[in-house]
Amino acid sequence: MALACGSATDNTAAPGNTAGGSTIPGAGGGAVVGAGGGSASGPNASGGAAGGGVDVTPVGPCKAGVPVTTQIPLLLNRQYAAVVRDLLGVTAVGTTPVAELLVGDFTGAMTAPAWKVYQDVGEKIAKQVMATPDSKAKFISCAPTAADCLKTTIETFGRKAFRRALTAEEVAAFMTLNSATPAGTPDEVAEAILNAFLVSPSFLMIPELSTELATDNPPTAGAIKLSHQEVATRLSFLLWGSVPDAELNKAADDQLLGTKDQILAQAKRMILVREKTGEFISTFHSDWAQMNNSSAHWFKGKHDTAVYPDYTDASRVANKKELDAFFEEVAYTGSFKDLLLSNVAFVNKDNAVAYGLDPSKYTDALTKVTLDSATNPRPGFMTRAGFLSSYASYGSTSPILRGSFMAIWLLNVNVPAPDPSFALQTVTGDFKTNREYVEALTQKVQPCKSCHEAFNPLGFVMENYDGIGKWQTKDPRGGDITAATTTATITFASGPKTITSPVQLMQEIASQPAAKQLYAQAWVSFATGRSANENDQCTVDSLQTKLADDGYSILGLLGDLTQADSFRLRVRGSL
């Protein structure tokens, strides 16, 4: 049965509104138009963190008010994948993960090629669902030929897929597929309806179309109060990266998400669903640590096996899983400080050697271990094999990459991009350690010298960890790694300090107000899908103050993100 529905089944496209002039091509030559003057765009229409990632660009002092945000952001690929998993039980089409079938996350108006990809993916998913009994039952639980089965399916599945109840007009539009020509079998009609849902704007986007003005708080007067369903959607995508569950939908339909206390109560419940929130927490921290393959650092997943014979495809996979497990564990049991100081590791037979452990004592499954801080110092995520092997060169460590990450993302050091007109430097000599080589290379001329002085020392302290994260006392260049190799003078906000070990370095970073401020700002950026601005800075400042308390948990931070006025209000703007 040929599907030609496009926007015909979805009233998100409000007549007369053109989303600031941008349109999304619909199937069959139709057009899906943005609603209410919003922008039919990705999550970063205001120029924020690309791909729904994190951004820590300084924004200035706090200014009371609700920030202007995009009105109809597009689902990120990871969100799309999570939604079809939760609604339909689909994690892959064939053997390809759903997110990998889509175009890369983007900003701006939907393009015709991107729209064609969404149509193709929706068609493939719908076909697979109808051919898979368990997935089919999640979509349609009655016989398509039974009286009112299709209408009931449209209403019940549509409530979940659109994150709101469908209008009578929308239900009727979906029902027209039952009388389309040429006629299809009952299962083909059901498949066409599911396909139509998967390409509808209210599924692919997260529209916020409420118009009720908020008048309860003078600083937010004139802002628009989100509907209870819109608040539920914000909650679910913030904490789960997916659609609301039945309990959250019921709270929304019962009008029980209008106050901060009501929102926080639901947030606390949802945070405890670890299989959902834990995954989202790991995703944030991977983005924050620039481990999501979108950052510009040089590592592309390969190392010289002649130098590092223990590094394999299996160890690389284990390293990624370990980092995810580490981030989740610290979030559920610790604080920001623990991210930088915890000696907990997750080990299996593929990554055990990186921690000096016997691989034969482990299986494929990751096992939580607490490493001996005296004999196996591994403070925090930046000493995990996954991080260290990513922030490394093909055949050596990279103090430059490791140091620049710490400088930019934890210490708020302004590291400008290299001048593209400046020639890449080379240096020759009998260098016994990588530190000697890097110092000769980057201290040779200006502007290299002044720039690298800001972050190279941070990386030098980490030279006992080799290019794949193992502890080393001998450099691959032949020299011994001594205390002199790993000692550096580093200038913090309070002044210069001599740092002699990774543990001392992480303790110092964990105590820095800048590190807490940047971490809070990264969360705000990630949660909103855009760069933080001066209105968001008020929330950032509040979270930074709370992070100064070592007893303040990361889960507490998640709950507090839902308490900002900007979580339940929005302001119209031109984005």
Residue ranges with predicted function:
Residues 107-155, 465-520:
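Short, functional "switch" segments adjacent to catalytic/cofactor/reactive centers
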Residues 145-193, 201:
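A conserved hydrophobic secondary-structure block that centers on an alpha-helix together
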